[in-house]
Amino acid sequence: MGTLLALVVGAALVSSAWGGCVEVDSDTEAVYGMTFKILCISCKRRSETTAETFTEWTFRQKGTEEFVKILRYENEVLQLEEDERFEGRVVWNGSRGTKDLQDLSIFITNVTYNHSGDYECHVYRLLFFDNYEHNTSVVKKIHLEVVDKANRDMASIVSEIMMYVLIVVLTIWLVAEMVYCYKKIAAATEAAAQENASEYLAITSESKENCTGVQVAE
């Protein structure tokens, strides 16, 4: 158990030491009438490299074939396209206070069925090196389904099952440790009692012999 705890603590320290940007996939199921966050995270390969980044989001509604641009975010300015499906519903939720964007996520408020479809987060990054500049581009694709009621995904179900299994295993281990300790303490107590009894009998026997010797001498 001590080894397991050490490994867990070590992993946490390593994770903390690395820190920085971590690319995470977006959820793909939004609930009708609720606010939904579409994740778009694009990390630099080298965090120490200076960069400037901007993004454009495009959308293809379910049942259609063409992508249309819905927004552009550059130099901390959000430019929304005229689209009644997203009018007053899109909120920037990515990096702020920097031109070096790595989190380019957005919120869609009051989700409707018209928001079902495919989203593309286009990331355009200009990297600055000592003697030159380099342009890169990445496209993050997200397929979104809008449902009436939230469904639990398989990952959360498995996580909950594993949590209960871990609780049961730890409980059994704790009970076994308590039984083992109880037996060990009981055995030690019994051995000490037997040792005390033996010492008492030896002292009693010696006292009787001394008394007998005194009577004979008289």
Curated annotation (Swiss-Prot):
Record's bilayer topology term: Single-pass type I membrane protein
Tissues and organs where the protein is expressed, per its UniProt entry: Detected in hippocampus CA3 bipolar neurons (at protein level). Detected in skeletal muscle.
UniProt entry keywords in alphabetical sequence: Cell membrane, Cell projection, Disulfide bond, Glycoprotein, Immunoglobulin domain, Ion transport, Membrane, Signal, Sodium, Sodium transport, Transmembrane, Transmembrane helix, Transport
Ranges of residues in domain Ig-like C2-type: 22-150
Pfam families on file: V-set (PF07686)
Signal sequence segment: 1-18
Compartments it resides in: Cell membrane; Perikaryon; Cell projection; Cell projection, Axon
Residue ranges annotated as Cytoplasmic topological domain: 180-218
GO molecular function: sodium channel inhibitor activity; sodium channel regulator activity
Glycosylation site list: 93, 110, 114, 135
Predominant cellular place of this UniProt entry's protein: membrane
Functional description taken from the UniProt entry: Regulatory subunit of multiple voltage-gated sodium (Nav) channels directly mediating the depolarization of excitable membranes. Navs, also called VGSCs (voltage-gated sodium channels) or VDSCs (voltage-dependent sodium channels), operate by switching between closed and open conformations depending on the voltage difference across the membrane. In the open conformation they allow Na(+) ions to selectively pass through the pore, along their electrochemical gradient.
Quaternary structure, from the entry: A voltage-gated sodium (Nav) channel consists of an ion-conducting pore-forming alpha subunit functional on its own that is regulated by one or more beta subunits. Interacts with SCN1A; regulatory subunit of SCN1A/Nav1.1. Interacts with SCN3A; regulatory subunit of SCN3A/Nav1.3. Interacts with SCN4A; regulatory subunit of SCN4A/Nav1.4. Interacts with SCN5A; regulatory subunit of SCN5A/Nav1.5. Interacts with SCN8A; regulatory subunit of SCN8A/Nav1.6. Interacts with SCN9A; regulatory subunit of SCN9A/Nav1.7. Interacts with SCN10A; regulatory subunit of SCN10A/Nav1.8. Interacts with NFASC.
Family (UniProt): Belongs to the sodium channel auxiliary subunit SCN1B (TC 8.A.17) family.
Full protein name: Sodium channel regulatory subunit beta-1
Organism field: Mus musculus
